[in-house]
UniProtKB/Swiss-Prot annotation:
Name of the protein in its database record: Uncharacterized protein C144.01
Biased composition regions of type Polar residues, renumbered to the chain: 8-22
Keywords: Nucleus
Region forming the signal peptide: none
Length: 112
């Protein structure tokens, strides 16, 4: 920065500190005015809120996937339970067939 620019910047700073309302060329003052003149944009706010919700939802899903993962021992237990259910169903079917073989379910053979 040249000497002249540095001196003028220093003087502007001193003047703005003495009377902040007098100098309308101030950088921060322009920033404040620009902020006030900006129109209200609800679309952006809604989009930001949606992004935050989606982000939280994704984080929750990732966390649940990590914590709720089925361990190998749990998988074996589930397989054993399913096998027991299948064998029970198979036995019921076999029993029904056996009973049918003797004519229990045929109405012609039933004697009341």
């Amino acid at each position: 920065m040249s000497k002249l620019k540095a001196q003028s910047a220093l003087q502007k700073l001193i003047e703005s500190q003495k009377n902040p309302n007098a100098n309308e060329d101030g950088y921060f003052r322009r920033k404040r005015l620009a902020k006030k003149e900006r129109p209200f944009e609800p679309k952006k706010l809604v989009q930001q809120q949606q992004r935050l919700k989606e982000k939280k939802k994704n984080e929750n899903i990732i966390y649940l996937k990590k914590t709720m993962r089925v361990t190998p021992s749990e998988e074996k237990i589930h397989e054993m339970i399913n096998q027991k259910r299948e064998t029970k169903k198979r036995k019921r079917k076999q029993k029904k067939k056996n009973d049918d073989d003797y004519g229990v379910f045929e109405e012609d053979m039933l004697e009341l």
